[in-house]
């Protein structure tokens, strides 16, 4: 019996057509609302769902690309105390996230890939926006008088 999976299961991912035994389909998949039987109506719905998912995926990629451009144009300025050789403190992912939020850019703290910047001058921090997209944020650290 052919069914369309509604949710991810051990048999496959959501929105895929699989072939299972009638008993398994009736007693487990349909009962737990994990699948629906394949017919002309559900097949049309599947095509529409896949198109909608593809559109949403493209829109998300466009948003990520715009966000990457916006982040790479940005320069964050921080002041740290210290003398010529040593710096007291560090710029952490938490501080970077806070500054980005002030500028209107919201990213997850775990996306900011830094272990803390503790040197004066210019540094670059990677911000992982997706599995394939990484933006480089420019950070300038000056001496606080």
UniProtKB/Swiss-Prot annotation:
GO terms classed as biological process: translation
Family: Belongs to the bacterial ribosomal protein bL9 family.
Organism: Mesomycoplasma hyopneumoniae (strain 7448) (Mycoplasma hyopneumoniae)
Signal peptide: none
InterPro entries per the UniProt record, alphabetical: Ribosomal_bL9, Ribosomal_bL9/RNase_H1_N, Ribosomal_bL9_bac/chp, Ribosomal_bL9_C, Ribosomal_bL9_C_sf, Ribosomal_bL9_N, Ribosomal_bL9_N_sf
GO cellular component, one term: ribosome
Classification lineage: Bacteria, Bacillati, Mycoplasmatota, Mycoplasmoidales, Metamycoplasmataceae
Pfam (any one): Ribosomal_L9_N
Chain ranges passing through the membrane: none
UniProt keyword Cell inner membrane, yes or no: no
Entry keyword annotation includes Flavoprotein: no
GO molecular function, one term: structural constituent of ribosome
Keyword annotations from UniProtKB, A to Z: Ribonucleoprotein, Ribosomal protein, RNA-binding, rRNA-binding
Function field: Binds to the 23S rRNA.
NCBIfam families from the UniProt entry: L9
Protein name as catalogued: Large ribosomal subunit protein bL9
């Amino acid at each position: 019996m052919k069914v369309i999976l509604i949710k991810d299961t051990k048999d496959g991912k959501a929105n895929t057509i699989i072939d299972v035994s009638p008993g398994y389909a009736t007693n487990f998949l349909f009962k737990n609302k994990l699948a629906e039987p394949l017919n002309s109506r559900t097949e049309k719905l599947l095509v529409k769902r896949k198109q909608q998912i593809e559109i949403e995926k493209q829109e998300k990629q466009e948003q990520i690309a715009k966000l990457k451009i916006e982040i790479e144009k940005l320069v964050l300025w921080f002041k740290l105390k210290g003398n010529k050789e040593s710096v007291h403190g560090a710029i952490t992912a938490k501080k970077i996230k806070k500054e980005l939020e002030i500028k209107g850019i919201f990213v997850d703290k775990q996306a900011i890939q830094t272990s803390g910047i503790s040197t004066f001058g210019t540094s670059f921090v990677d911000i992982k926006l997706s599995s394939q997209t990484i933006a480089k944020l420019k950070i300038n650290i000056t001496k606080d008088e």
